[in-house]
Amino acid sequence: MQAVTLQADVRSPEACQKLVEDTAAAFGRIDVLVNNAGITADKLLLRMTEADFDNVLATNLKGAFFCTKAACRFMMHQRYGRIISVSSVVGLHGNAGQANYAASKAGLIGLTKSAAKEYAARNITANVVAPGFIATDMTAVLSEPARAAAEAAIPAGKIGHAEDVAAAVAFLAGEQAGYITGQVLCVDGGMGM
């Protein structure tokens, strides 16, 4: 398997188009798209500004829309593709202080399920990985008591790692998942049960 890592401001449709075109130029095709850009701007709903809301949705949801739209053009011509969007259990259940993040991640699930229905006949699958509490830079800012409380709420009794999420993404990108589309795979240690 070959991969390339490119950087772009996913809030820009032009940047997303260039990102996809540059990837296609490097490999001659686009087989897998992973929508993984994500930011937070956590505040209680009453304190959240419109800018807080818009910035999170622009990156987390509109960025995935722009990238998916650009990549699907290549995938449709190939009659093959795998789209994997990284959402969150927060997109399924909500979370206090994260209305913008929850809305963006719930929207990402809807976007991906719609793409699954639109492109299944072209041998393009679209699925969601919804991580729970994962040790990342985004969760590293939490206080130790908050981290301990989160860990205690996970039936598996531990916090997940990036490798756990990567394994789910790799599975959905592979041939073994060719008949799986429109699904949400929670990688959360049982947190969402």
Give each language-model segment a name:
Residues 88:
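Residue(s) in the substrate-gating loop at a strand-loop-helix junction
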Residues 8-19, 50, 163-164:
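The beta1-alpha1 cofactor-binding region of Rossmann-like NAD(H)/NADP(H)-dependent oxidoreductases
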Residues 29, 120, 125, 180-182:
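Short, small/polar-rich loop/turn modules that mediate ligand/substrate recognition or access, typified
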Residues 44-45, 52-57, 150:
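Substrate-binding pocket helix/loop in short-chain dehydrogenase/reductase
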Residues 128, 151-176, 180, 187-189:
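C-terminal helical subdomain
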Residues 68, 104, 112:
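Active-site helix of classical SDR
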Residues 73, 117-121, 178:
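Alpha-helical segment proximal to the catalytic Tyr-Lys
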